């Protein structure tokens, strides 16, 4: 990998992905492992590839990602968000395509907290009439 890179930070739920794009031949490393090995499900692989496929840069860039926190899906979506942001820095012309696909928007949905006096965030304790 060359020294010049483009940086982007992606977030989803509690996952944070720090992404670097290098000129290369399409290799994607997540936490120093090939992404096919790190994300075992085909749906997650598709999520990670989505931004590169949309911009037709799949075989031309190497991606190096450090991701922490959250679960597998949250991490995959954080990686996608980070790659999308880095692509905007690489080529500002791509912003419109990525924005239209919704890849630059931070998905702000978070887990709602459990409230006291209840079983969960919304669920109440069972009510007994008698």
UniProtKB/Swiss-Prot annotation:
Lineage top rank: taxon: Bacteria
UniProt-annotated stretches for the region Disordered: 108-130
GO molecular function terms noted in the UniProt entry: RNA binding; structural constituent of ribosome
Keyword Ribosomal protein in record: yes
Keywords in alphabetical order: Ribonucleoprotein, Ribosomal protein
GO CC terms in record: cytosolic small ribosomal subunit
SUPFAM superfamilies registered for this protein in UniProt: Ribosomal protein S5 domain 2-like
Gene3D superfamilies: 3.30.230.10
InterPro entries to which the protein is assigned, alphabetical: Ribosomal_Su5_D2-typ_SF, Ribosomal_uS9, Ribosomal_uS9_bac/plastid, Ribosomal_uS9_CS, Ribsml_uS5_D2-typ_fold_subgr
One of the protein's GO biological processes: translation
Sequence similarity: Belongs to the universal ribosomal protein uS9 family.
PANTHER family named among the record's database cross-references: RIBOSOMAL PROTEIN S9, SMALL RIBOSOMAL SUBUNIT PROTEIN US9M
Name of the protein described by the UniProt record: Small ribosomal subunit protein uS9
Natural source organism: Solidesulfovibrio magneticus (strain ATCC 700980 / DSM 13731 / RS-1) (Desulfovibrio magneticus)
